[in-house]
């Protein structure tokens, strides 16, 4: 079974204590720099160069929600490319979902191996900067996922989690 690299250099999987959490700002942003979208000498290496803007190898999530407890929806307006960087934003919605954020994910399936991302984690309660692999019902597979998450309330720690057949709750917090 292949994993979808949800190269979701995701500025929000808002999950602080069962919800999106409060913030003094109604809008927060995340700059992410990376090499990308070129293949290197290895046939298994993919890099993304955001100086070229969005790549055809990736998609911007839009029009769906990640549901409870996150209460967030994805919008293409929350993913922009400027000065060689991708910027993901989160803002208040005011409708059925409390927040709207940005997600950028690969279109390709990748197997097991080494994954690497260069990102600047946002420091803000209720926000998570993350990188994860995912496969699930949207790919006609069981829900399997590996998460690497920097929680905005304390960016000196990274949280790891995994799901197998939809069962999670394997969180491990690591001090950086």
Regions found by a protein language model. Give the residues of each.
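GH16 jelly-roll
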Residues: 35-176
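C-terminal motif of bacterial Sec signal peptides marking the signal peptidase cleavage site
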Residues: 16-19
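Repetitive helical segments and hydrophobic/amphipathic motifs
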Residues: 11-12, 127
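Ser/Thr-rich, Pro/Gly/Ala-heavy low-complexity intrinsically disordered linkers and tails
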Residues: 26-38
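Bacterial signal peptide processing site
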Residues: 21-24
């Amino acid at each position: 079974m292949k994993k979808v690299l949800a190269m979701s250099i995701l500025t929000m999987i808002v999950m602080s204590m069962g919800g999106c959490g409060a913030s003094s700002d109604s809008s927060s942003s995340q700059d992410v720099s990376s090499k990308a979208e070129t293949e290197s000498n290895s046939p298994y290496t993919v890099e993304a160069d955001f100086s070229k803007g969005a790549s055809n190898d990736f998609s911007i999530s839009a029009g769906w929600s990640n549901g409870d407890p996150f209460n967030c929806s994805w919008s293409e307006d929350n993913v922009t490319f400027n000065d060689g960087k991708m910027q993901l934003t989160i803002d208040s919605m005011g409708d059925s979902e409390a927040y709207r954020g940005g997600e950028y994910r690969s279109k390709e399936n990748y197997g097991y191996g080494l994954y690497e991302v260069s990102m600047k984690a946002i420091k803000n309660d209720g926000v998570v900067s993350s990188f994860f692999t995912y496969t699930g019902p949207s790919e006609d597979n069981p829900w399997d996922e590996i998460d690497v998450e920097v929680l905005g309330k304390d960016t000196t720690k990274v949280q790891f989690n995994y799901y197998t057949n939809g069962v999670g709750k394997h969180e491990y917090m690591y001090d950086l």
